[in-house]
Amino acid sequence: MGRSPCCEKAHTNKGAWTKEEDQRLINYIRAHGEGCWRSLPKAAGLLRCGKSCRLRWINYLRPDLKRGNFTEEEDEIIIKLHSLLGNKWSLIAGALPGRTDNEIKNYWNTHIKRKLVSRGIDPQTHRSLNSATTTATATPTVNNSCLDFRTSPSNSKNICMPTTDNNNNSSSSTDDTKCNSSTTEESQSLITPPPKEEEKSVPLVDLELSLGLPSQSQCNKSVSLNSSSSGFYDLFRPPAKVAQRMCVCKWTLGLQKGEQFCNCQSFNGFYRYC
């Protein structure tokens, strides 16, 4: 539901007011006062709507209206109030008796704007035009720069090395450690890993191959190795004691039991015929 019209507009006049209409409106208001603007046109004998009668009276027919041009004092008041209130022309008109809001608005758009521009002042912000242009050009354009740390060669780490004071043993525990900042490459070069136990226990394997039995020097080498690898080299060691000397000549030459041994020389538990 919209607002109801102020009057029936079917049989109302539109356009400029005539002098006869102005005089009828003045005479009625002087005799009866303003009253209700919706019923006033019919009572005054005017073929106008109530809104048209109200605007005609306030803006043109009031007896307290000032006629003529605006003074310099009124111009300064309008400029000061506009800088504070903006385009609230009805409030500005309240500070200027005899001036209407419509009159002040028209005067602002036709005269005061040009006056402010000639002074180098922006009519909207009431600031100097030069400062407005300089601030607009002086604002730097900040570009969003992204830093990519994914391809950095080495990531920095903080390595805390405990340090003790020989002179003062009663220092606080918070001062016992000092942190040194270094890269991963430097820390790896400074700290050498301890040798693994597997590398210590694994013996060196002799790769010299021979068809015969191992010699006495090779046996001495095997004895000097770690005890943990002795079981592995027991397979290559000759027996410590030979139960009995055995001569091949006993069977080949037909020597009997109890006869004198031959001239064979023993070599590592076996006999070689001379």
From Swiss-Prot:
Compartments, record wording: Nucleus
Record keywords, A-Z: DNA-binding, Nucleus, Repeat, Transcription, Transcription regulation
Record-level GO cellular component terms: nucleus
DNA-binding region: 37-61, 89-112
GO MF, one annotated term: DNA binding
Domain (HTH myb-type): residue spans on this chain: 9-61, 62-116
Pfam families: Myb_DNA-binding (PF00249)
Tissue expression: Expressed in flowers and weakly in roots and stems.
Top-level taxon of the source organism: Eukaryota
Annotated region described as Disordered, given as residue ranges: 157-201
Record-linked Gene3D superfamilies: Homeodomain-like
Function as written in the Swiss-Prot or TrEMBL entry: Transcription factor.
Protein name: Myb-related protein 330
Species name: Antirrhinum majus
